[in-house]
Amino acid sequence: MRLIPLKSASQVGLWSARYIVDRINGFKPTAERPFVLGLPTGGTPLNTYKRLIELHKAGEVSFQNVVTFNMDEYVGLPEDHPESYHSFMHNNFFSHIDIRPENINILNGNAPDLVAECKRYEDKIKSYGKIHLFMGGVGNDGHIAFNEPASSLSSRTRVKTLTEDTRIANSRFFGGDMEQVPKLALTVGVGTLMDAEEIMILVTGHGKAQALQAAVEGSVNHMWTISTLQLHPKGMMVCDEPSTMELKVKTVRYFQQLEAANIGRL
């Protein structure tokens, strides 16, 4: 597993955006052979989306032949609700780039049959062969997407009950009222993520330090779903300095030396 230790959340956003642009451009996607990109929501990737928009407007990348799959969506929120992940993605990314609407894939949390919707989503991903790069974030408790602690490490896209900790954390988007946060969500599974050709996890802030430590220095453990990244042949974590506070100094120095050339690309 790779660890890219940077100074700030802003640097994490810039580095990850440039990495995505380089992957897309290197792939040379066409309508018949699109680049397939997995995407998250939440506060952490906002810097990345901002930088991607800037790079697109500067003419450095086109998303016309990029197909996206989002990680998750709340159950029961209308798509046009301000806190739905459909709204989040439209407002913070999709409406600012040249992606084709038919290439955007987000789970439908209002589908009449949620189990069938999850199977449809898995089948749609498989129809493209694989996701080439899945970008994600991580929760304070180590969850990826809505794969909460004790999730099966081979899980597929499914309905999940959100923990109280996750609902409290997300209540900041709902006026601080946890009761307004849905109790259920649809989410890609850990196994779904692991099927991607490459996974890039963004980690910023002191609150994520314990999760980063578990992912990098701990054992693979279903109580820390992020630790599954150790088993991926192309797993990478891009982190800022505050999030490394629980790592051993020698661990951080090791990756600083190992990735010096890549860090220097900023």
From Swiss-Prot:
| CDD domains for this protein | GlcN6P_deaminase
UniProt keyword list? Allosteric enzyme, Carbohydrate metabolism, Hydrolase
Q: Name one Pfam family in it.
A: Glucosamine_iso
Q: Where is this site: Part of the allosteric site?
A: S151, R158, K160, T161, Y254
> For this chain's UniProt record, which GO biological process terms are given?
carbohydrate metabolic process; glucosamine catabolic process; N-acetylglucosamine catabolic process; N-acetylneuraminate catabolic process
**Catalytic residues in the record:** D72 (proton acceptor), D141 (for ring-opening step), H143 (proton acceptor), E148 (for ring-opening step)
Q: How is its activity regulated?
A: Allosterically activated by N-acetylglucosamine 6-phosphate (GlcNAc6P).
Per its record, the protein catalyses: alpha-D-glucosamine 6-phosphate + H2O = beta-D-fructose 6-phosphate + NH4(+)
From the record, give the transmembrane residue ranges. none
Q: In which pathway does it act?
A: Amino-sugar metabolism; N-acetylneuraminate degradation; D-fructose 6-phosphate from N-acetylneuraminate: step 5/5
InterPro entries xrefs: Glc/Gal-6P_isomerase, Glucosamine6P_isomerase, Glucosamine6P_isomerase_CS, NagB/RpiA_transferase-like
Q: What does this protein do?
A: Catalyzes the reversible isomerization-deamination of glucosamine 6-phosphate (GlcN6P) to form fructose 6-phosphate (Fru6P) and ammonium ion.
Family from the record: Belongs to the glucosamine/galactosamine-6-phosphate isomerase family. NagB subfamily.
Q: PANTHER family given for it?
A: GLUCOSAMINE-6-PHOSPHATE ISOMERASE
Protein name listed in UniProt = Glucosamine-6-phosphate deaminase
Q: Which organism is it from?
A: Aeromonas hydrophila subsp. hydrophila (strain ATCC 7966 / DSM 30187 / BCRC 13018 / CCUG 14551 / JCM 1027 / KCTC 2358 / NCIMB 9240 / NCTC 8049)
